[in-house]
From Swiss-Prot:
Stated family: Belongs to the PAL/histidase family.
Residues recorded with modification 2,3-didehydroalanine (Ser): S144
Position of the 5-imidazolinone (Ala-Gly) cross-link: A143-G145
InterPro entries in the record: Aromatic_Lyase, Fumarase/histidase_N, HutH, L-Aspartase-like, Phe/His_NH3-lyase_AS
Record bears the keyword Magnesium: no
GO MF annotation, one: histidine ammonia-lyase activity
Post-translational modification: Contains an active site 4-methylidene-imidazol-5-one (MIO), which is formed autocatalytically by cyclization and dehydration of residues Ala-Ser-Gly.
EC primary class: lyase
NCBIfam families, alphabetized: hutH, PRK09367.1
This protein's name: Histidine ammonia-lyase
Reactions the enzyme catalyzes: L-histidine = trans-urocanate + NH4(+)
Length: 510
């Protein structure tokens, strides 16, 4: 288990990837404490002076002009958490909630939120104790922030709701006992600061980003395997072609294929003088398609890395002047659009992979046995595996419809344009599973095709990837229960082992 000393606003994507996939212990860097204390002191000064400021001693949304008396300020903060915890659906995975909590801690600790150190330390202790609030997946429109999910997270501080501890669901009070904590009373602005922000949608989108990066790496390796299995040409990866166009993602993708395929192999040398003039697009245009996907993944990484370190609650406290200013950083449009772009990339990675599977099983295109099996007719081979891949790729095309173009007014039209970022990000998990399934089938098909090319050998990287698969799935010599093969291939992809095949600097988080 790793230990992170959090310097607010400085999380790297590599660190965030680790937080999203592994448990950790957390502590605040000493230099953050002064900013937190100054910020919360400004809020207390406003109350002491009897000034009226939105978010501190007013109502919310359409009720923003309603002044709240000092005696009701703690009740106001408790009430907003309870009333806004209106999510529905299955609970988020513990890993998602852990990342959401760390992102919220990171944001609150920047010193713009007017929240006490005691509250931030409470969240840190929950993370360290592995006590994660139970947060329903559905119920946020991504403005004003992820209100429902973050309210469910905040319930735990009040001793309300449920938590998850080592896979067991229990009451928040039981979870607090395990963490050695007592419920706390929230002071002015603290409830609003906790539940206002984009941390739920950002956590989900970051998980989608890391999956997309893994699947891009896998798609590159498996795509190179298919080039060798189908006896494809290396000339489409010539750097001069891609330099002439000038698209960086495409140039980098082409370079990656040159890295994986090398200058030549026994297989490539065997068909130098073949009669085939050009390969189908699913082989030949991989740099163009994967390069475009790479560009979208990189842009999403930049946006989400910034958002993970940003302050997205409202209003914000500015220490240099003592001003408290209302704005709209809670609007998650950047997250929604980044997630939409990731969705398009995930759909395309799966779509072109499915076409390569179709190519490999078609003897007219691949010059391999029909459906990649001996004694065809008696054996059906990869016939229905390709149908499964087609079903998964097709499902992703529907998922890829942009969520950010939708909006429904809420809060009596005060919040009249919203981002739908949480759904935009949440569907990335299903899309990643689908694309992973398509690539798992292509990995099986490409390895099978390479076995038919024996004794000719592919490039070293392709041979290594095939050997990894053959450790868990044997050659398909005759029909057998196909499901376990797909499952084993999928499990191999889940290890992210193909990430190590990529040169440094291709992707942002590793």
């Amino acid at each position: 288990m790793s230990h992170l000393v959090l310097k607010p606003g400085t999380l790297t994507l590599s660190q965030i990837r680790d937080i999203s996939r592994n448990k950790l212990t957390l502590e605040l860097a000493d230099e953050a404490i002064a900013d937190i204390n100054i910020s919360s002191g400004i809020v207390q000064k406003i109350i002491d002076e009897g000034r009226t400021v939105y978010g501190i001693n007013t109502g919310f949304g359409l009720l923003a002009n309603t002044k709240i008396e000092d005696k009701d300020l703690q009740l106001l903060q408790r009430s907003i958490v309870l009333s806004h915890a209106a999510g529905t659906g299955q609970y988020m995975q513990d890993a998602t909630v852990r990342l959401m909590m760390v992102l919220k801690i990171n944001s609150l600790s920047r010193g713009f939120s007017g929240i006490r150190l005691e509250v931030i330390n409470f969240l840190i202790q929950l993370v360290n104790a592995e006590v994660y609030p139970c947060v329903p997946e559905k119920g946020s429109v991504g403005a004003s922030g992820d209100l429902a999910p973050l309210s469910h997270m905040s319930l735990t501080l009040l001793g309300e709701g449920e938590v998850s501890y080592k896979g067991q669901i229990m009451s928040a009070k039981e979870g607090l006992e395990i963490a050695g904590l007592e419920p706390i009373e929230l002071a002015a602005k603290e409830g609003l600061a906790l539940l206002n922000g984009t941390q739920a949608s950002t956590a989900l989108a970051l998980e989608g980003l890391f999956n997309a990066e893994d699947l891009f790496a896998a798609s590159s390796v498996i795509g190179a395997m298919s080039v060798e299995a189908a006896m494809g040409s290396r000339s489409p990866f010539d750097p001069r072609i891609h330099a002439a166009r000038g698209q960086k993602g495409q140039m980098d993708a082409a370079g990656l294929f040159r890295h994986l395929l090398g200058d030549e192999s026994e297989i490539s040398l065997s068909h130098v003088d073949c009669e085939k003039v050009q390969d189908p697009y699913s082989l030949r245009c991989q740099p163009q398609v994967l390069g475009a996907c790479l560009t979208q993944i990189r842009q999403a990484a930049e946006v989400l890395g910034t958002e993970a370190n940003g302050v997205t609650d409202n209003p914000l406290v500015f220490q240099d002047t003592g001003d408290i200013i209302s704005g709209g950083n809670f609007h998650a449009e950047p997250v929604a659009m980044a997630a939409d772009n990731l969705a398009i990339a995930l759909a395309e990675l799966g779509a072109i992979a499915e076409r390569r599977i179709a190519l490999l099983i078609d003897p007219n295109l691949s010059k391999l046995p029909p459906f990649l099996v001996e004694n065809g007719g008696v054996n059906s081979g990869f016939m229905i595996a390709q149908v499964t891949a087609a079903a998964l790729a097709s499902e992703n095309k529907t998922y890829a419809h942009p969520a950010s173009v939708d909006s429904l007014p809420t809060s009596a039209n005060q919040e009249d344009h919203v981002s739908m970022a949480t759904f935009a990000a949440r569907r990335l998990r299903d899309m990643s599973e689908n694309t992973r399934g398509v690539l798992a089938i292509e990995l099986l098909a490409a390895a099978q095709g390479l076995d038919f090319r024996a004794p000719l050998q592919p490039s070293a990287a392709v041979a290594k990837a095939k050997a990894e698969l053959r450790e868990v799935v044997t050659y398909y010599d005759k029909d057998r229960f196909f499901g376990p093969d797909i499952e084993a291939s999928t499990d191999l992809l889940l290890t992210s082992s193909f990430n190590s095949y990529l040169p440094a600097g291709i992707l942002a988080s590793f």
